[in-house]
Amino acid sequence: MEELVGLREGASKKPVPLQELWGPCPRIRRNIQGGLEWLKERLFRVGEDWYFLVALGVLMALISYAMNFTIGRVVRAHKWLYREIGDGHLLRYLSWTVYPVALLSFSSGFSQSITPSSGGSGIPEVKTILTGVVLEDYLDIKNFGAKVVGLSCTLATGSTIFLGKLGPFVHLSVMIAAYLGRVRTKTVGEPESKTKEMELLAAGAAVGVATVFAAPISGVLFSIEVMSSHFSVWDYWRGFFAATCGAFMFHLLAVFNNEQETITSIYKTSFPVDIPFDLPEIFFFVALGAICGILSCGYNYSQRTFLFFLKANGFTSKLLATSKPLYSALAAVVLASITYPPGVGHFMASRLSMSEHLETLFDNNSWALMTKNSSPPWAAEPDPQKLWLEWCHPQLTVFGTLVFFLVMKFWMLILATTIPIPAGYFLPIFIYGAVIGRLFGEVLSVAFPEGIVAGGRVNPIMPGAYALAGAAAFSGAVTHTLSTALLAFEVTGQLVHALPVLMAVLAANAISQSFQPSFYDGTIIVKKLPYLPWIRGRQIGSHSVTVGHFMNCALTTLAKDMPLEQVIQVVISTDVTQYPLVETTESQTLVGVVKRTHLVQALQTEPASWAPGQQPCLQDILANGCPTQPVTLQLSLETSLHETHNLFELLNLQTLFVTSRGRAVGSVSWVELKKAISTLTNPPAPK
C-alpha cells in the first residue's frame, strides 16, 4: 500500500502516499504542515543554535529556581520543628541530627542505586569530557534525574552539612545541553558533529554557573578557567548569550514571586563609594591574599591526602564500596552533632543559613569595636535584624568564634567532600574565605580603631571589604581561578573594591598554583580520570625533549598489500581503536587511518573461504567500501614535548602518529605524554 501514490492537489502535483490522502482532512493537514515548514525556515535563518541556547538558559533557570523554592520550604520546616519541639535536649538533638542523616542517607542511596556517576561535584568529569574523552553514563538522562533528586536532598540539610550546588548544576546543565544537541540534530536533519556537541557543552558549563549565582559574566569566565585550557572565541560569545538568558530568567522568577522588588544582586552590601579604601590598605589586601593562598595549599593537600587514605584503608574502602548510605549517615551524624546549637555549634554561628553567613560577614561595621565594652547575651533565637550577634558569644570574643569556625570547618569541609552524594563544594570554600577575610579585617580594626590616616583624612577599616576579598581570594586559590573576583562583585553588586580584591586574588593564586594542583584537578588525580597534566614552569626542560624520546615504537600498521588472513590476525591480537594505513609493507608510507569498527564490519561481510589463488588483500576490502580517514596531522621525531602537549590540548586529541620522511615509525597518546611529563616533573633518583 505504501508504494501506491496519488497526486497532490494544486500546482505542484508532487506525488504523495495514498495513505496520506485517505486520512482525515488531508488539505488542512497539508496546510498545517506547510505552514510549520515555512515557519521553521524563517526562524532558522538566523541560526537554529540560538534557539537551543535560549532554551538551555531558560530550562536551567527554571530548575535552579524551583530547587531553591522547594529547598527553602523544607529548611524552614526543619527550623520550625527544632523551635517547637520544646526544651528537652534529647528531642532537640534528635530533631537537629536525624533530619540531615535521613536526607543524606536517602540522597546517597537513591543516586547511587540509579547510577554511581551521579555522586560528587561533576566538574572533574565535565572537564574530562570537554577534552574529547567519552565517559559512559555521565551525560545520560537517568543521571540527570538521580542528580536532581540527590542534590535536592543534600541542599535540604542546610548549613548543618554545609554543601552547595555549583558543581552539580554545571553537570546538570551540560547534560541538558547534550540532550538539546541531540534534539537539534534530529530537528535540523544534519549528521552528528563532535564539534557542534562540544560547542553546546561548553555553553552548558557557563549556564550552570550563571543560574546558581545569577552572575552571567563570571559564570562564563569561571567555566573557561576551570574546564578549559584553550577556549574558542565562538564558544565565548555563545556562552555569554546562554548564560545571560539563564541569569535574566532566574532574576525574573524571583521578581514574579515577590522575593525581589526588581533585578538586583543576591547579597546586599553598603560599602561607601567616595573613599572605600585608602592606599596603605592595598598592602593589607595583598597580605590577605597571601594568607589565603597558603591556607588553600593546606586545604587542597589535606583533602586529596584524606581521599587517598579512605581508598587505602580497608574498612573505609569496603564501606564506601558496599554501604555508601551507611557511610553518609555516619558522616552526617558527626557533622550534625558538632553543629548542634546548644553544643559547640553556638561557637560557629550554626543557626545561620549559608546565605545568612555571607550577609553577616559582609557587614561594614566592626564587631570587635561594637562589643569592646559589653558582651551581648546569646539570644534564644536569632534576631533577624541583628544576625551578626550569632558570631558573638559571651564565653568567647568575636575573634574566638571566627578562629573556632576556621579550625572546625577546615576538617569538616574535607569530611563533607568524601560523602558519596551529589553536592557542590564551591560555596563552602567561598564562605570559608569570607571568614578568613573577616577575621583579618577585625584584627585591623582593633589595631587601627580610629582608622588609617592618609592625606590628612581618617578612613575607618571596613572588615566587610576584607571578607569580600577573602572570599574571592580563597575560593580562587582553591580552584585556581581569577574570575572569583568578578563573581564577588556580581553577587554583591559592588565594584568599589575591584582593585584590592583582584590583587588579593592574584596573590593567592600565585602561591597556590606554584605548590598544589587545584581542587578539581586533585579530584581528577584521585579518581584517575583521563586528563592531561599541565606543564608547569620552564625549568623542567619540556622544549628540549622531543617525540623520539617518549613515543611508542611498537606500532601496528596495516599495509594495503597485506593478505586478508594477516589482517584478521592483527585485528584479533590487538584492541586499538584505529590502525595506521600504509602503502606497502616495505615502504611503510603513511597514507591514512582505518577505524577498527569499520574494518570489523567489512571483514564480517567477506566470505568465510576463498578459492585457491583468489584470496583478497586489504586493498580489495577498502575498494569494497570500507571507509578510511586521511592523516590531517602527524608528528615528526623532532617535535618537542611542549609543542605536542599544546597540540593535544588545543585540538582535544587522543592519539597522533609519528612519521620520519613519510614512514610511520611510532605513535603518541595520552599515556606517553603523561609518562614524559611525570619523568620531567619527578625525575628518577640516580642509581
Swiss-Prot record:
Matches recorded under InterPro entries: CBS_dom (IPR000644), CBS_dom_sf (IPR046342), Cl-channel_core (IPR014743), Cl_channel-K (IPR002250), Cl_channel_volt-gated (IPR050970), ClC (IPR001807)
Compartmental location: Basolateral cell membrane
Catalysed reactions, as listed in the record: chloride(in) = chloride(out); iodide(out) = iodide(in); nitrate(in) = nitrate(out); bromide(in) = bromide(out)
Main location: membrane
Residue ranges annotated as intramembrane: 116-127, 203-224, 349-360, 464-496
Organism, scientific name: Mus musculus (Mouse)
Name of the protein this chain belongs to: Chloride channel protein ClC-Kb
Record's bilayer topology term: Multi-pass membrane protein
Domain CBS positions: 551-609, 626-687
Binding sites annotated in the UniProt record for chloride: S121, F426
Effect of gene knockout: Mice are born at the expected Mendelian ratios. They develop hydronephrosis and polyuria associated with metabolic alkalosis resulting in early lethality.
Keywords annotated in UniProt: Calcium, CBS domain, Cell membrane, Chloride, Chloride channel, Ion channel, Ion transport, Membrane, Metal-binding, Repeat, Transmembrane, Transmembrane helix, Transport, Voltage-gated channel
Keyword Ion transport listed: yes
Binding residue positions for Ca(2+): E259, E261, D278, E281
Gene name for this UniProt entry: Clcnkb
Transmembrane region(s): 51-82, 91-111, 141-160, 161-180, 236-255, 282-310, 325-342, 400-420, 421-440, 500-520
Disulfide-bonded cysteines: none
Function text: Anion-selective channel permeable to small monovalent anions with ion selectivity for chloride > bromide > nitrate > iodide. Forms a homodimeric channel where each subunit has its own ion conduction pathway. May conduct double-barreled currents controlled by two types of gates, two fast gates that control each subunit independently and a slow common gate that opens and shuts off both subunits simultaneously. Assembles with the regulatory subunit BSND/Barttin for sorting at the basolateral plasma membrane domain and functional switch to the ion conducting state.
Subunit structure: Homodimer. Interacts with BSND.
Molecular function per GO: chloride channel activity; metal ion binding; voltage-gated chloride channel activity
Family note: Belongs to the chloride channel (TC 2.A.49) family. CLCNKB subfamily.
PTM annotation, UniProt: N-glycosylated.
GO CC annotation terms, alphabetical: basolateral plasma membrane; chloride channel complex
Residues in the Cytoplasmic compartment per record: 1-50, 521-687
